[in-house]
């Protein structure tokens, strides 16, 4: 089971134009700061957040309880000109968990409803014995094939096209994909096998002409899984395996509980 939290800014659209449209550079900076905060605060508890649309953030929160969610929510209220609503859900796959969390928030009203404020709810249950499976995917030799040859925008366009195709293919497995900078993607993919990834990469190569590789990490928390995925990707980059997918798994049952600070200093 994987636990997902959907974070949504309350009534954000109307706020950006009230009483007049706010300066775009300020809005972009504000959205980026919220994403930074969410990663720092969930990350302090071994979680991991993805910006998606900035006004909606998806986080992997295995091991993070309701009280910690409330503290993070209060921190946003105290330091930002808006509030956020949160819903938590768990499921066998990442896509299903975010679907349940999204539906829970939607039950309280529209994202632009001025009376819906600081929702905090749990769709089903908090995960105690679940696991997180993450794939760190990147493009083979993007520097030599794109960055050093094409314009910055054309390289960006190729990366975005690859991202879209990757996301579409992952959804077929009830998984998700998020761009994390450069030519890198982080993919919550509970239940997928190495064979699934190899087949998917072949389809993407045929449609986009892009070669991909992936380190897969399986761990108790998002931090554990992402660290293992990063190491797996380095194994491929360093030529220590002939395969384009490499998996590392944490001995979850042997992991000792560690006490973390409730809040990350910002």
Curated annotation (Swiss-Prot):
InterPro entries found in the cross-reference section: GTP_CycHdrlase_3 (IPR007839), Nucleotide_cyclase (IPR029787), Rev_trsase/Diguanyl_cyclase (IPR043128)
Keyword Protein transport on entry: no
Pfam families: GCH_III
Keyword Hydrolase: yes
Gene3D superfamilies referenced in this protein's UniProt entry, alphabetically: 3.30.70.270, Nucleotide cyclase (3.30.70.1230)
GO terms under biological process: biosynthetic process
Keywords: Hydrolase
EC number of the protein: 3.5.4.29
MF GO annotations: GTP cyclohydrolase IIa activity
Superkingdom, natural source: Archaea
Catalytic activity: GTP + 3 H2O = 2-amino-5-formylamino-6-(5-phospho-D-ribosylamino)pyrimidin-4(3H)-one + 2 phosphate + 2 H(+)
Similarity comment text for this entry: Belongs to the archaeal-type GTP cyclohydrolase family.
NCBIfam families: PRK02240.1 (NF002587)
HAMAP family referenced in this protein's UniProt entry, alphabetically: GTP_cyclohydro_3
Role of this protein: Catalyzes the formation of 2-amino-5-formylamino-6-ribofuranosylamino-4(3H)-pyrimidinone ribonucleotide monophosphate and inorganic phosphate from GTP. Also has an independent pyrophosphate phosphohydrolase activity.
Protein name: GTP cyclohydrolase III
Organism in which the protein naturally occurs: Methanococcus maripaludis (strain C6 / ATCC BAA-1332)
């Amino acid at each position: 089971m994987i636990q997902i939290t959907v974070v949504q800014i309350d009534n954000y659209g109307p706020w950006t134009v009230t009483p007049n449209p706010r300066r775009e550079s300020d809005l972009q900076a504000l959205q980026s700061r919220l994403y930074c905060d969410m990663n720092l605060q969930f990350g302090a508890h071994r979680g991991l957040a993805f910006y998606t649309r900035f006004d909606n953030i998806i986080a992997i929160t295995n091991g993070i309880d309701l009280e910690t969610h409330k503290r993070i929510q209060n921190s946003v209220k105290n330091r930002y000109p808006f509030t956020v609503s949160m819903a938590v859900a768990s499921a066998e796959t990442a896509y299903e968990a975010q679907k349940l969390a999204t539906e829970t928030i939607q039950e309280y009203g529209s994202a632009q409803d001025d009376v819906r404020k600081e929702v905090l709810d749990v769709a089903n249950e908090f995960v105690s014995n679940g696991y997180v499976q993450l794939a760190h995917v990147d493009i083979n030799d993007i520097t030599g094939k794109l960055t050093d040859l094409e314009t910055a925008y054309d390289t960006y366009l190729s990366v975005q096209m690859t991202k879209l195709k990757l996301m579409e293919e992952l959804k077929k497995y009830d998984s998700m994909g998020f761009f994390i900078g450069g030519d890198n993607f982080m993919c919550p993919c509970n239940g997928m096998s190495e064979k699934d990834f190899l087949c998917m990469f072949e389809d993407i190569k045929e449609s986009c002409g892009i070669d991909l590789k992936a380190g897969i990490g399986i761990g108790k928390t998002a931090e554990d899984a992402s660290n293992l995925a990063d190491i797996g990707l380095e194994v491929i980059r360093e030529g220590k395996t002939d395969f384009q997918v490499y998996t590392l798994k944490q001995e979850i049952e042997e992991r000792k509980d560690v006490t973390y600070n409730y809040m990350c200093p910002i």
